[in-house]
């Protein structure tokens, strides 16, 4: 597997509340994670850092999970535990009250990838030169869009587009979505925070993914493009390709 991770403060924010990275378990099986924190007085930094650290630390203690079912079970269970830890920590620290974070994570399983998400950080897959969104935003605006109360154009500039219906660290239990999709050697997986998707039109995102650039160059272009559109939020991008020689390996 080849992965490229980038995070950038953007052009407006004074600090970066996004977090993420690539982490391996005892059998070198990778997990990729992106989290976007929220809350005043840098509480968002704490929430996203905790989510990534706790989930990756738990992953580092596992051995290879070979089936999608095993991975889904592990993600559901572990993300619940991470959520409880964040809630308890926020309750113990007065200035962290109200903090929370989104989370999107992915683990490879044979010729598939398992995605888990909470909030509005997204997962996309480029397959056969077509990009599609795998995750569903857990946000007020997405719910209004889903029920037909607003148009896609309205959603882009909606004044309440930052209101989440689900996040880690808010309540004692959180609903986690998981998806299992085919992931072949010619495919590219993109995990990102809304600092990318709120700035860069999806048609341009698809063109970047389809381009002949290297994976590293694509990651850089995503950050540059989001900043060129205004960089109004922190921007985090994680790109994943499966290496050709790893196609038949369980932990590739």
UniProtKB/Swiss-Prot annotation:
Compartments where located: Cytoplasm; Membrane
Gene behind this protein: stp
SMART domains from the UniProt entry: PP2C_SIG (SM00331), PP2Cc (SM00332)
Disulfide bonds: none
Co-factor(s): Mn(2+)
Its job: Protein phosphatase that dephosphorylates EF-Tu.
Chain intervals for the UniProt region annotation (Disordered): 1-22
Domain of life: Bacteria
Cellular-component GO terms for this entry: cytoplasm; membrane
GO molecular function, one term: metal ion binding
Catalytic activity: O-phospho-L-seryl-[protein] + H2O = L-seryl-[protein] + phosphate; O-phospho-L-threonyl-[protein] + H2O = L-threonyl-[protein] + phosphate
Domain PPM-type phosphatase: from-to ranges: 2-242
Leading EC class: hydrolase
Membrane topology: Peripheral membrane protein
Binding site for Mn(2+) 1: 36-37
Co-factor note (free text): Binds 2 manganese ions per subunit.
InterPro entries in the record: PP2C (IPR015655), PPM-type-like_dom_sf (IPR036457), PPM-type_phosphatase-like_dom (IPR001932)
UniProtKB keywords: Cytoplasm, Hydrolase, Manganese, Membrane, Metal-binding, Protein phosphatase
Enzyme Commission number(s): 3.1.3.16
Residues involved in Mn(2+) 2 binding: 36, 194, 233
Annotated family: Belongs to the PP2C family.
Protein name: Serine/threonine phosphatase stp
